[in-house]
Design a protein with these regions (language model features):
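Exposed beta-sheet edge and beta->alpha loop/turn motif
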Residues: 95-140
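Short solvent-exposed beta->alpha transition segments
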Residues: 39-40, 54-105
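Sterically constrained small-residue positions within well-ordered secondary structures
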Residues: 6, 12, 89, 103-105, ...
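Solvent-exposed, well-ordered amphipathic alpha-helical segments
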Residues: 7, 44-48, 60-61, 107-110, ...
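Short, low-complexity N-terminal intrinsically disordered segments enriched in polar/charged residues
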Residues: 27-51
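A general boundary/transition motif marking the beginning of the first structured unit of a protein
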Residues: 1, 33, 45-46, 67-70
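Sec-dependent bacterial lipoprotein signal peptides
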Residues: 1-28
Length: 140
């Protein structure tokens, strides 16, 4: 090979390397899918409920202002009663699954479609509306 061909090959390899690096940078700097993040947040909040972490479930609900402690306690009791009702009617919720999620980033909202798998082998698809506030997804 002569020097001209080596120069052309070297330039071609440099160009391929530069394009590869640019693609890598673009792929690494992309933001996570908002619908996917909202879906994972919804699942986590409902998993807290299944684990008996009622306070964490209630804290996952969006409220623009703080609430009195007595009202928070009522919400926690409501969550416990809901789980008791599910236990009586379906032998409890055993698992939650994400089916789909759609996000409207302009409005900072998402709809997460989940399936509740009950202890009596039945399932129920549930729509979980979510809202984003300061980069965190909350149950609406």
């Amino acid at each position: 090979m002569d020097l001209i061909h080596l120069g052309i090959i070297r330039k071609a390899l440099c160009a391929v390397l530069i394009v590869s690096c640019q693609l890598l940078i673009v792929n690494c700097s992309t933001r996570p899918d908002p619908a996917g993040v909202a879906a994972q947040a919804a699942k986590q909040y409902y998993d807290y409920l299944l684990e008996g972490k009622y306070e964490a479930f209630i804290d996952g609900q969006y409220r623009p202002d703080s609430i009195p402690g007595s009202y928070r306690e009522q919400l926690i009791m409501n969550a416990k009663m809901f789980m008791g009702q599910q236990q009586r009617e379906h032998r409890g919720i055993k698992e939650t699954r994400i089916v789909n999620a759609e996000a409207d980033t302009a409005r900072h909202e998402a709809n997460v479609f989940m399936v509740f798998c009950y202890g009596d082998s039945t399932t129920e698809e549930v729509l979980v509306p979510m809202v984003e506030n300061k980069g965190i997804w909350y149950l609406r």
